[in-house]
Amino acid sequence: MAILKASEIRELSAEEMKGKIAELKRELMKEGVNKSTGGAPSNPGKISEIKRTIARILTIMNEKEAQAKNA
């Protein structure tokens, strides 16, 4: 999966964001298993980039929730 930029994430609906998080978590799990079994990573920075993207999505979701409460 391609890494998403914040501007791309902001255009997604809440359901799409949840779907992306689930997809990224599956990918992260797959990469973690590959790493723990001693396999060579296809891209060494991929795990941290996936984690960063998940955090980015969660942050934007929380921002949107906070705006909805204040509005």
UniProtKB/Swiss-Prot annotation:
Transmembrane segments: none
Gene Ontology biological process terms in this record: translation
SUPFAM superfamilies linked: Ribosomal protein L29 (L29p)
Example of a GO cellular component annotation carried by this entry: cytosolic large ribosomal subunit
Keyword Lipid biosynthesis carried by entry: no
Keyword annotations from UniProtKB, A to Z: Ribonucleoprotein, Ribosomal protein
Gene3D superfamilies: 1.10.287.310
Molecular function via GO: structural constituent of ribosome
HAMAP family registered for this protein in UniProt: Ribosomal_uL29
Family: Belongs to the universal ribosomal protein uL29 family.
Protein name per its UniProtKB record: Large ribosomal subunit protein uL29
Species per Swiss-Prot/TrEMBL record: Methanococcus maripaludis (strain C5 / ATCC BAA-1333)
Gene that produces this protein: rpl29
